[in-house]
């Protein structure tokens, strides 16, 4: 495995950092990043290595405000900015000597699976998009939503007075997001992340303001001329398979594939025993539509 530390600029002046896994010859490339408040070290490096072994160059980078990438405040998530960063990551890869600029795939996992789709709808340089277990529902439980929005407005007032941003846990001890977003996490799996040095179990309260304002569904109709594959684990308890399928059905692009993976959940659909079969189908999709 050959891996390089790389960095690239965004249009608004940040530096995003990640790992480049160069292929053996000039050809296709994948631009890949992680989900909500999650650094690149979790789950995806093995996936990047697998694609590299198939001859595909891969960029796996930290989203802004996360991990090694720039951005303040830390652990602040702005979905619309993550879409823009996909464009700038693609620009970086298109200039790389190992990359065929007409064969660049956006690859998103979990939260970034939706930002990848929106980016693909807005950027016709994208050769194809692979959306793995997308977070497809942005509804919040009413009580928690009202509380967190009140706190977010208080935080804005406080920030203008010169105070530090307010943070809340990403996932509480009960496995639920305290802002009322989404379903319960498997705490046995989640605690494995908590024991690492690179994962921080907190997010700015403003992140949930931005998520509530994030309405990606309308952008699905913009995906035309870009092949799309959605990979949905049938046992996903974090993002409903029915919600994921509903998003898939919004996409007008005829060259689209829906891969419903039996017996897998949100956090093991592309990792662990049996995952190679899932990755092989993704590779076949890429080869079919990008001709390599």
Swiss-Prot record:
Disruption phenotype: Completely abolishes the production of fumagillin.
Associated pathway: Secondary metabolite biosynthesis; terpenoid biosynthesis
Function noted in UniProt: Polyketide transferase; part of the gene cluster that mediates the biosynthesis of fumagillin, a meroterpenoid that has numerous biological activities including irreversible inhibition of human type 2 methionine aminopeptidase (METAP2). Within the pathway, the polyketide transferase af380 catalyzes the transfer of a dodecapentaenoyl group synthesized by the polyketide synthase af370 onto 5R-hydroxy-seco-sesquiterpene to produce prefumagillin.
Keyword annotations: Transferase
EC id: 2.3.1.-
Classification lineage: Eukaryota, Fungi, Dikarya, Ascomycota, Pezizomycotina
Protein name: Polyketide transferase af380
The keyword Cell division is annotated on this UniProt entry: no
Organism: Aspergillus fumigatus (strain ATCC MYA-4609 / CBS 101355 / FGSC A1100 / Af293)
Any one of the GO BP annotations: terpenoid biosynthetic process
Keyword Amino-acid biosynthesis: no
Entry similarity comment: Belongs to the polyketide transferase af380 family.
PANTHER family: DLTD N-TERMINAL DOMAIN PROTEIN (AFU_ORTHOLOGUE AFUA_8G00380)-RELATED (PTHR47751:SF2), SUPERFAMILY HYDROLASE, PUTATIVE (AFU_ORTHOLOGUE AFUA_2G16580)-RELATED (PTHR47751)
Top-level enzyme category: transferase
Induction description: Expression is controlled by the fumagillin biosynthesis cluster regulator fumR. Expression is also under the control of the developmental and secondary metabolism regulator veA.
GO molecular function ontology, one term from the record: hydrolase activity
Stretches the record annotates as Abhydrolase domain: 46-267
């Amino acid at each position: 495995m050959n891996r390089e530390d790389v960095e690239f600029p965004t249009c608004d002046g940040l530096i995003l950092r990640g790992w480049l896994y160069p292929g053996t010859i000039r050809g296709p490339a994948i631009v890949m990043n992680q989900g909500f408040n999650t650094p690149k070290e979790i789950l995806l490096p093995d996936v990047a290595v697998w694609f590299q072994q198939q001859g595909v160059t891969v960029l796996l980078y930290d989203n802004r405000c996360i991990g090694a990438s720039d951005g303040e405040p830390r652990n602040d998530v702005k979905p619309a900015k993550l879409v823009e960063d996909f464009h700038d990551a693609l620009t970086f890869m298109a200039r790389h000597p190992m990359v065929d600029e007409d064969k660049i795939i956006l690859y998103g996992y979990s939260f970034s699976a939706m930002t990848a789709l929106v980016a693909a709808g807005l950027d016709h340089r994208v050769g194809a998009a692979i959306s793995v277990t997308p977070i497809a529902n942005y509804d919040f439980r009413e009580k928690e939503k009202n509380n967190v929005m009140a706190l977010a407005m208080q935080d804005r007032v406080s920030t203008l007075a010169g105070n530090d941003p307010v943070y809340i846990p990403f996932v509480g001890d009960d496995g639920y997001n305290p802002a009322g977003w989404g379903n319960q996490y498997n705490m046995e799996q989640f605690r494995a992340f908590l024991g690492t040095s690179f994962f921080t179990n907190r997010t700015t309260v403003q992140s949930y303001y931005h998520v509530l304002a994030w309405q990606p569904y309308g952008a699905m109709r913009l995906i035309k001329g870009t092949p799309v594959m959605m990979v949905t684990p049938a046992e996903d308890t974090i993002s409903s398979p029915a919600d994921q399928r509903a998003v898939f059905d919004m996409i007008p692009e005829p060259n689209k594939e829906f891969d419903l993976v039996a017996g897998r959940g949100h956090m093991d659909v592309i990792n662990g025993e049996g995952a190679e079969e899932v990755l092989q189908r993704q590779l076949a999709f890429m080869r079919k539509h990008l001709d390599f």
